[in-house]
Amino acid sequence: MPRLTIAYDAHDPARLARFWATLLDRQPTDDPLPPGQTLPSTLLPGADGQLGLRFTPSSTAKRGANRMHLHLTSTSDADQQRTVAKALGLGATHLDVGQRPEEGHIVLADPEGNEFCVIEPGNSFLAGCGYLGELACDGAREVGLFWSAALGWPLVWDQGEETAIQSPQGGTKVAWGGPPDAPVQAPHRQRFDLTAPGGDQQAEVGRLTGLGATWLRAAADGSAVLIDPGGNEFRLHR
């Protein structure tokens, strides 16, 4: 099955990678430069089932709310406040998305405006998922079913239009909250990046389109650009 990384387009990928590397306590590494790209992408590999993050150079401006955002977990109220204080010290800002005062999570934006939440302690859904507990996405049930099959990750939640999947080894959950969705806006500044198993990109494209993806184009870096059943672009690398 393909390996999943979450890619962020960024005006300053090195700075954004430093923010997330420090917040997540990870070691950044430079990706090899693809053809036509002059600024390096930076990868924050995940371990023990935690999603990896990739930051790629782009001049595209952020428009509206992202269709996916990260959830960081907390072990106590004090731990939640420490995470928030650390994030603010690194350049994050508080964000009002209409959350109610009685809700325990804290909504922040990273230095390029990407939303993320620091979840309150005692959240049973994210118990045992690790510090990067969840990637929360917009999307109907068919999107979750597609990604479950595409990644070989079983459904761990399937209620109404809400779905969630998790690697068989545990770790970060990927969840879709059902409608209403935020509008799909191109170009897609956040996306799933997949690495084809064994480097066989052509065979993997065939498998993914057979599951319901749509072929879009070949990118300049040699990756295949596809669209999932929810209209979200993703890339498949060799």
Model-derived features: where do they sit?
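Short, small/polar residue-rich loop motifs at catalytic or cofactor-binding pockets
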Residues: P101-E103, A219-D221
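Glyoxalase I/VOC metalloenzyme domain signal
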Residues: M1-L33, Q37-L39, L43-D96, A109-G160, ...
